[in-house]
Amino acid sequence: DQKPELSLPAVADRVMEALGKYDFIVTNFANGDVIGHTLNTAAKLEACKHVSHYLDVVVHDALAKGYVVAVTADHGNIEKLYTAAGKPDGAHTTNLVPFILMDPAHSGPIALRDGCLGDVAPTVLNVMGIPQPAEMTGKSLAEGHDFGKDRKMLLIICDGWGLGSGDDGDAIHLADTPYWDSLLAEQSWSKLHASGEHVGLGSGKAGNSEAGHSNLGAGRCVMQDDVRLD
């Protein structure tokens, strides 16, 4: 918690170096999970500020270079500051996570449906015009949108970045996050399940990075070890 920005400036630089070189780029902003596990409220607010700032930097560059950009999360964490007993909370949550989609070739809103993490990879394939394999049982979150041909895409995963309560117990709400606020106010977005049976965990169980990233990449619900062993 002594360096809430972690290596995010360097991560952002690497992403921007890759823009224009690769058709598909995926990056992980780890601050929400790493700093979210601490009990340091000031550090959490600072981490949220850095995530918002570097989203602004990276997303603007990607859109200017013609990339379709999606911003989502693998599970919740940093948004919840306190337990039900009012004590500092550093655990993962069962909160929904956002899925924001921006298409620089389209000026109007994009119709998005709510879903789960297993729907993200099919959405990527939809954007890029790649046939979806039978093994992916998820469905595109933007089935009705015409992305055209030969599109490039940037997927940003904000680790541990759930949709919180929107009050004084919500770090993202309290933090100085003007760009994040503008994304929710101005861009098309939907809500994704990132916990419990929706990601192959036990019912009611908080999401985690392993379940989150495996579902995001697989395009389906991946049964996790705690369920498989039961």
Language model features with spans:
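Feature captures the catalytic ectodomains and active-site-proximal regions of enzymes
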Residues: 1-230
